Amino acid sequence: MEINIKRLTDSAKLPDRGSTLAAGYDLFADVTEDVTIEPHETKMIGTGLAMEIPVGYFGGIFARSGLSAKEGLRPANCVGVVDSDYRGEIKVALHNDGEVARVVTSAEKIAQLVVVPFLSVSFNEVDKLTDTDRGEGGFGSTGKH
């Protein structure tokens, strides 16, 4: 699958995979000066890229495992969604869960993009839902022994 992508700045780096079988494409910061993210603070970091995600797909913006586990930096909304009709700059709301300030520099890997198919659905309002063994059992209800 090919995705049309546009560099909005000369310094923007195209998404890149860390290995040939990686599902995620690394997204890189494109900032004119270093950005300091204080502990428990969120800052919007641009990538300098815009793209055309094909209809029937969305771009999921996920944390990079090492960046979140080792340094406490992750997308603030846990998973960002880039819809197929969005044409603006791809940005990452990066949150610092750590206890020390973190400096983000240009061309640094900040998140990963996974292109995911989805189904378009319609919702059918009903008065009653079908019964299941689980019923209305919610959080933790299936983990009990």
Label for each model-derived stretch:
Residues 1-145:
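DUTPase catalytic domain/fold
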